[in-house]
């Protein structure tokens, strides 16, 4: 019998992506870790919270986190 190796989930991506109840992939915004003083208040406010992964990236990310 041939032993099949299980595919592992991408551990770095598992920490950055959450899955909603409707199976949407939620991610945080970029450009908010430092140098926030040079950004406007509106920019910093809009970078808070999470957003959904775009459809063009969805299938690629879904294959990387197959275990979740």
Curated annotation (Swiss-Prot):
GO terms for cellular component: ribonucleoprotein complex; ribosome. One of its GO terms (molecular function) is structural constituent of ribosome. The keyword Kinase does not apply. Keywords: Ribonucleoprotein, Ribosomal protein. Disulfide bonds: none annotated. GO terms for biological process: translation. Belongs to the bacterial ribosomal protein bL35 family. This is Large ribosomal subunit protein bL35. The lineage of its organism: Bacteria, Bacillati, Mycoplasmatota, Mollicutes, Acholeplasmatales.
């Amino acid at each position: 019998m041939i032993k099949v190796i299980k595919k592992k989930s991408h551990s770095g991506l598992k920490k950055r992506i959450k899955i909603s109840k409707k199976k949407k992939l939620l991610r945080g915004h970029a450009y908010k870790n430092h140098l926030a003083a040079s950004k406007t208040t509106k920019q910093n406010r809009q970078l808070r919270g999470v957003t959904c992964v775009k459809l063009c990236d969805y299938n690629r990310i879904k294959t990387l986190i197959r275990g979740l």
